[in-house]
Amino acid sequence: MGEVRERSFELYPPRTRAGLDPGLPGEFAARLARLRKAHRELSGRRDAGSLGVIDLAPIKERMGPRWDIVRPIVWANVEACLARGLEDVELYVAADEVTVWVLALARERRELERRLALIAADIGERLLGVAPGGAGPVARTLPFDYETELATLAGMLGLRERVRRAQRQLAEAEAARLREHATELVALYRPVLALRVPLIVGFRAFARLATASGALVVPWTLCPDPATGAFDAELDRWLLAQAMTHLVPGRPKAELPVLAVPVHRSTLATPGFRGPWLNLLTELPAVMIPRLILELVDRTPQRPPADLRGMLASVEGRVAFVIVRVPPDPSAIAPLAGSGARAASIDASTLDPADPGTVVRLAELAAACRAAGLRSLLVPVANAVLAEEARAAGIDYIAGDACLPPLRAPGPPMDLRKAARAT
């Protein structure tokens, strides 16, 4: 039954009146022209506009091999929610089996973001019975000049090319934003403390931006609302290059650090971002590979992707091992089993040390890591109470202000007991 449905399912024609049909080029062009006119009248600007993108990839990842069977159900719900959430002149078009482009009226990008978030939430709610674990779509927007880009457009091929061009231009602008401020970036290294035995086992590298007042802030203040992963990919390359300056052959082994360097999921998942980053990584001398650990991160910790093993295959043999950043949810840790990751770095930013249930929750997280064959790292640990709770719960490692402050240059692993006796 599933095979029949898969063969018969097509993205076109759309299932609602709000959908654009590339098979009808005359109507395709006429509806885009009406949208441009309405948007110009609304905004008062010829260059205004944002393209909405609804990404169904998280649902496909969650469904795994069942995707081909449930895809018609997913799309029926997606199109129904779009039809309900869009105005008469507004449009959507399926770009591929996991991507919808939304052309809607909005005076500013934020307004469209809010509307798309509501539509995405509606889709996720309707799919609760189909996608276990509550997997839902991701909505985002990118600036898109309706007046110029939609003019003289009569088909999907032209629209696809213009969207890709807009994405390339935006990616270049976001990457340039970081390069323009590269001299203000600072690489810092935070010690990672083992809890069973007081050892500094390594350092987590991270970047900060030095302001005119001398304060250090997160680099994302330069690009708080990215439409592509270009800014993060540029930051990943910059930080990897800084870390590699501390992994130079010829230094005594006792002086060499062990470094965990972050890379964003979007960097590894996007060929155009992954290639330059991997090219830099290959410059690391083979003898230094045991000293470099990769930490897969997101700006906000997410559940691991279904294709994590394939994603990590690109770095196999080029780093000592991989850590994956996850939210504080045992169900987000279980999928790491067999993925190639060796540890989970658990986000502690939402944990309340004063909550009596925190120790129990930490114990569940530590147990989930052990069940998946992983070491557990809790970050950031901001105070001594949470550090002690992590120790009591069986967490393996912690890093944060409660341990030791970050350094401008990392040092070698250190037994804190010996260091204490030496002083």
Task: Please place each PLM-identified region on the residue numbering.
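EAL-family c-di-GMP phosphodiesterase catalytic domain
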Residues: 2-8, 209, 295-302, 324-423
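Conserved helix-loop-beta segment at the catalytic/binding core of cyclic-nucleotide signaling proteins
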Residues: 49, 79-109, 132
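C-di-GMP signaling machinery
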Residues: 1-32, 41-43, 143-188, 196, ...
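EAL-type cyclic di-GMP phosphodiesterase domain
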Residues: 62-66, 212-238, 265-273, 284-320, ...
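Conserved long alpha-helical elements within nucleotide-processing catalytic cores of c-di-GMP signaling
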Residues: 5, 9-36, 43-50, 57-80, ...
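Bacterial c-di-GMP phosphodiesterase EAL domain
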Residues: 165-286
